[in-house]
């Protein structure tokens, strides 16, 4: 995690100031639009999620970061998130009977694995997370 802060600080020291300006604009926007309950940050562990996470930290806004467990998550990714972002909440979706929704249960329901053209897994495993925001 420290590497990201170092990289952001190095980017802010660019002579042309373009990246510094973009970071500052992002920080100001996060502050300007901060919801009363804070932000719900969907966190995948990827570079974009890490960037948003660190921008939220820099802006000093209230936020919770959430990782949607799919049951086919790479162990290296899970270890990385737990080691570097210990405050990220791991969330799993459940059926109405309380059983966890897994990739394997979805394949059985749909009678085929997800494909490039048939993508049902995100709708069941990732998109239900979050909370409604009213403007």
Can you name each region flagged by the protein language model?
Residues 2-135:
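ATP-dependent adenylation/nucleotidyltransferase module used to activate substrates
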């Amino acid at each position: 995690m420290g590497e990201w802060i170092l990289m952001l600080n190095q980017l802010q020291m660019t002579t042309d100031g373009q990246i510094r300006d973009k970071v500052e604009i992002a920080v100001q926007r996060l502050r300007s639009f901060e919801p009363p309950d804070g932000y719900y940050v969907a966190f995948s562990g990827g570079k974009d999620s890490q960037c948003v996470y660190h921008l939220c930290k820099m802006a000093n806004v209230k936020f919770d970061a959430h990782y949607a467990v799919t049951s086919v998550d790479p162990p290296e990714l899970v270890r990385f998130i737990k080691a570097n972002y210990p405050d990220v909440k791991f969330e799993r979706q459940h059926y109405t009977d309380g059983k966890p929704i897994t990739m394997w249960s979805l394949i059985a329901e749909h009678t085929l694995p997800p494909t490039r053209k048939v993508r049902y897994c995100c709708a069941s495993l990732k998109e239900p997370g979050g909370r409604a925001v009213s403007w």
